Amino acid sequence: MSSGSLSSIRKKFLEFFVKNGHKLYASAPLVATGDASLLFTSAGMVPFKQAFTSGSSVDGAKTAVSSQKCLRAGGKHNDLENVGYTNRHHTFFEMLGNFSFGDYFKERAIELAWRFVTEEMCLSKDRLWITVYSEDQEAFDIWKKITGFPDDRIIKISTSDNFWSMGDTGPCGPCSEIFYDYGEHVQGGPPGSKDADGPRFTEVWNLVFMQFCRDEHGELNPLPHKCIDTGMGLERAAAVVQGVCDNYDTDLFKAVIRKSQDVFGSPDNSIAHRVIADHIRAAAFLISEGLSPGNEGRNYVLRRIIRRAVRYAYQLDPSNVAIHEVLPVLTKEGSAGYMGDAYPELVRCEQSITSTLRSEGEGFVDTLRRGMALLEKEIGGLSPGQVLLGDVAFKLYDTFGFPLDITLDIAKERGLKFDQEGFNKGMGEQKARSRKHWVGSGEDASHRLWEELQAQHKNTRFVGYDCCSTKASVLSITRDGMAVQSVNSGEKACLLLDVSPFYAESGGQEGDKGSITGVSGVKNSGGANIAEVTYTRKASNLHIHECTITSGVFNVGDTVDAAIDVDRRERLKANHSATHILHSVLRTHIDGNIQQKGSLVAEDKLRFDFNYASALTKEQIALIEREVNRRIMSNKPVLTDHCSFEAAVQGGAIALFGEKYSEHSVRVVSMGDSKELCGGTHVRYTGDIGAFKIVSESGIALGVRRIEAITGQSVVDGLRKDGDILLHISERLGVPVGEVSEGLERLLKEKLELKKKLVCAWHEIIKSSISPVNCGAGVVLHCGYFPTIPVDAIMEFMKSARKAERGIFAIATAVDGKAVLIIGVGDTASKVLGASELVKTLADLQGKGGGNAGLARVSLEVGNVQEALSTILNKVTAAFPT
């Protein structure tokens, strides 16, 4: 490992801060969880956000160090369109950072940073410059004391560049930055000057001193616990240490670019190779975390990244878009771009990454080729500086699925301006058309109604974890999307209660069913007011009980007894707990990077969707079943706990992508090795599940597999049914149950032998029943109609019959009321008259089919068979006259 390589700098940084009392934290996932404001982790401080806002420690640690995987492509942090055109922009990058949560502050942070850049990175003090916030005299004085710099080397910056805030309100504070001067031969001026945007002075490290909290009035109030948040981009740090101004000239990127040049050629097209090098890293890391290309959210960002790389590969070589062939430079140990030492998930998921990149590239190339041809037509006559009309880009996007970013890239390469307003207009009109043609079901109005009711009554209090029935008050009744005061027998309505034992559908688990019985209110003549709860769903944090009133009347304000269907709930609990165990087993025994992509917990089965590149083998399925059942039989207690989201994730709990979690309190469900954030209902002990059986495994999308399974009594019932079937088969075969397999093999072998004999008999019938017609040039025609002989037997006959080089065979049979005519022509005869030519002669008889010179197949009406054979006879005798 070179002392200046990316790997060595990462290693030095982490070891330096661990040695100086910091707790080492592994990188959090790129796919940000528990933070609705982020698509991806875009900064080193993101995993510690709650510690900064609360001033609390992280797992008891007051200091931390990490090398955080980051992605800026999509959402408010988006560098995608700049990648390839600048020296420093990336979609994926690593952020080195050290953090303090109420422990040390400015002086210690500055001292550690200075020691690292001068002693560990070995940067010359003469090349370093410092910036501080203009009002932060304290930081200025500390830097002056530690570095000995003159005042003009510590620059005061008055803009927001040197004052960081988490948002309009909340923690904030001044920043201080370390800059590196590449020297006079590079264009640019020092920070704060009019030439500061040039590459000569490069920001290496940013130190944020979080010491204030800005309130809603804009006032800055001192924080009780001052914090430190620092960030140093690893790629930029490597460029400085290696003495290059361009991140793409560092060791890792040079290796990836060389590999791209080997795969696609055109070494002079630096932009294309830079894009491929950057995007292959970003895509590989996202796929390793279980993401797959799609049309929404994070999945769409991944799709855009891959397709942009494919587009540049196409630019380099239109016949080759195999971007997956670049991947090994990152995953093969010993290669110059190897990242598997720091991120072993790349190596573990190499097959999945390769498969996803290949499939997405192959699936997109036709769209790309078609879109490029259409775009070339539109822009072929445009000169640099002219405008590419937005409606053209919209047509490509809307009609042909051609990504807008690729259109923008091409416009930029040609020096064209882009009519963004025209594109936006097309998008707006499309959305208006969609709204106009959409036939609604009152969902918007219904949603507003539930929001109003939630504002009035607050969230439903759910007590279903601890009890199966409770007394409650009817807060609201809705029928046909409108609030009503009462509902009568025979009507359907939704009842809203103040407290409910009914679990509302969420997290993949189906909602409860049961009954609501009136306790107070108007009694009917039979004395009982009863509502059957047919389903429970959630809207605006309210539990909506969908009911059919079976007797009596219900009024707003009534007191009721609410009771769930306990047997159904028990089956749901078993299936939900089994789903957690299945997820854990898949991650432990199949692939540690498997993640849930969807699930269904029903009363009669469970369904689990997960990322995996290939179908599970029979051996893998058997292993999964065996391990899940082993964990069930271990009868471990199922434990629940409530803690902060950050504490749960740090404690190893799995958070599911796409789910929204509170930062302050989440529910953690643990059973043995499984620990997940989950609000569903579960068994008390794993043994309560009873048993587990996989009933199917299939693929539902690119890189996504689905397992369906049953548990408990369903497994027992299934085994009993299978046993009955097995017993019936053994009785029919006349063998003991233990010998059924051998009996079936014997039966199948006998069947095959009989079929062979039958085929031979059919062939003899054909040969003995057709009369040869001798034509000229030694050609012999054989025609016949055998309505009871199967097509496959005739096809088999043709294989041997066509060995007669001057033979022509036309043999018909009947299938499902239609005639099928098989025509075979020997090699010598086919040079004059082929089988496919004979098919054409039957067009007047509505003969439909085709083939080649040696073999063809035609379908026609049974009544036309004899005329078809006569037509063939006439054609053959004309072609080969005697």
Curated annotation (Swiss-Prot):
Give the InterPro entries listed for this entry: aa-tRNA-synth_II/BPL/LPL (IPR045864), Ala-tRNA-lgiase_IIc (IPR002318), Ala-tRNA-ligase_IIc_anticod-bd (IPR018162), Ala-tRNA-synth_IIc_core (IPR018165), Ala-tRNA-synth_IIc_N (IPR018164), Ala-tRNA_ligase (IPR050058), Ala_tRNA_ligase_euk/bac (IPR023033), Thr/Ala-tRNA-synth_IIc_edit (IPR018163)
- Asked if the record carries the keyword Zinc, the reply is yes
User: What UniProt keywords apply to this chain's record, in alphabetical order?
Assistant: Aminoacyl-tRNA synthetase, ATP-binding, Cytoplasm, Ligase, Metal-binding, Nucleotide-binding, Protein biosynthesis, RNA-binding, tRNA-binding, Zinc
Cell location? Cytoplasm
Q: Which Pfam families match?
A: tRNA-synt_2c (PF01411), tRNA_SAD (PF07973)
Catalyzes what? tRNA(Ala) + L-alanine + ATP = L-alanyl-tRNA(Ala) + AMP + diphosphate
The cofactors it requires, by name, are: Zn(2+)
* Gene Ontology CC entries for this record: cytosol
Q: What is known of its domains?
A: Consists of three domains; the N-terminal catalytic domain, the editing domain and the C-terminal C-Ala domain. The editing domain removes incorrectly charged amino acids, while the C-Ala domain, along with tRNA(Ala), serves as a bridge to cooperatively bring together the editing and aminoacylation centers thus stimulating deacylation of misacylated tRNAs.
Q: What is this protein called?
A: Alanine--tRNA ligase
Q: Which organism is it from?
A: Anaplasma marginale (strain St. Maries)
